[in-house]
Amino acid sequence: MRLLLLLLVAASAVVRSDASANLGGVPGKRLKMQYATGPLLKFQICVSUGYRRVFEEYMRVISQRYPDIRIEGENYLPQPIYRHIASFLSVFKLVLIGLIIVGKDPFAFFGMQAPSIWQWGQENKVYACMMVFFLSNMIENQCMSTGAFEITLNDVPVWSKLESGHLPSMQQLVQILDNEMKLNVHMDSIPHHRS
């Protein structure tokens, strides 16, 4: 019983840390260029899809070419239902592994006969725990993967992988930024008339 209580406490800590995780892996941390004062280029990316390296490369090149642009990056969160499913699976996985290790039959609690897969799991605890762990992680990762690589400049969308279906090349991104910067300079130079 103590082991089950310990597993529940550990699972709630995992859920809280997963819910607050940001791009850097540290709760509340965002990757950003701290000292620039110009326009804000914001990346919202799917970290679990492996886009963090792409973001870091783009950030390096853009910060060299446009030193005045502030760059921020954060994880693009999936829809709340998928986040809740992933959190539930994270807790359920730990409870199920705990029950397998302890050898308690949860089906007896409900007055049901244990299925053959549960009996197999009791006979092969290591394999059963590994299978539960890896299958649950696979489903959790699928729920948390968005495939997003969204870019905004001063809160105006300039690229969306969700809409276009592919990442921008470095040349495309530089061309988009050049056009946006020229447009902003042009708009700032137009005299404003008072009525």
Swiss-Prot record:
InterPro entries: Selenoprotein_Rdx-typ, Selenoprotein_T, Thioredoxin-like_sf. Its main location: endoplasmic reticulum. GO terms for cellular component: endoplasmic reticulum; endoplasmic reticulum membrane. May contain a selenide-sulfide bond between Cys-46 and Sec-49. This bond is speculated to serve as redox-active pair. It comes from the Eukaryota. The chain crosses the membrane at residues 85-103. Its EC number is 1.8.1.9. It catalyses: [thioredoxin]-dithiol + NADP(+) = [thioredoxin]-disulfide + NADPH + H(+). It is an enzyme of class 1 (oxidoreductase). Pfam families: Rdx. Belongs to the SelWTH family. Selenoprotein T subfamily. Selenoprotein with thioredoxin reductase-like oxidoreductase activity. Protects dopaminergic neurons against oxidative stress and cell death. Involved in ADCYAP1/PACAP-induced calcium mobilization and neuroendocrine secretion. Plays a role in fibroblast anchorage and redox regulation. In gastric smooth muscle, modulates the contraction processes through the regulation of calcium release and MYLK activation. In pancreatic islets, involved in the control of glucose homeostasis, contributes to prolonged ADCYAP1/PACAP-induced insulin secretion. This is Thioredoxin reductase-like selenoprotein T. The lineage of its organism: Eukaryota, Metazoa, Chordata, Craniata, Vertebrata.
